[in-house]
Amino acid sequence: MNWASAVIVVFGHRSQFLGIFGGMGASSWLYFTPFSQSEQAALDCLREAVFARDAEYYGEEGVESLAALVESGWLEEDPAHSVLDVERIVRCEPDMEGPGDVRVLEGPEVVDLFGTAQPSRDIVQQAVKRAGDGWFPPFGRGSGCCTAVYGGDGRPEELCFWGTTGD
């Protein structure tokens, strides 16, 4: 995985996508969104923004909304290699998330993975580079993780979503 070739696209005023796209096989992706108490609401907004970015592509195929894309079954047959491939926030034990799930990392797991209970954006970006190496989640294709990202004042500023999807 070559995280050094990240692509940055800005959505709205603060959401960012840093993505890695491989040719064949799975792709890893990483997004930062403004912090929200509701991870599901943040994920839903992020997915809508990514769909809007790619709307011309899907529109050429007659798909005019994210809901229509999900209903069409398109993503099961031809994954988007992005956050469009996941849809629900879950809280479960590590490695128990299923396809389409984004598992929230909290508490001791955050400390274990990031070395601090309040990881900054830089810490998260560096740590997530290890995703898919067999010990950093998510462990399977078709799922993701998220965690709060903290500013210098110790308050959460962003949510980070990352995962591995594709064929």
Positions of PLM-derived features:
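N-terminal domain-onset segments
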Residues: I8-F11, F17-F139
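Proteins with a high burden of low-complexity, intrinsically disordered sequence enriched in S/T/G/P/A and R
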Residues: A6-V10, L18-S27, C145, V149, ...
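Acidic, proline/glycine-rich low-complexity IDRs
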Residues: Q126-D167
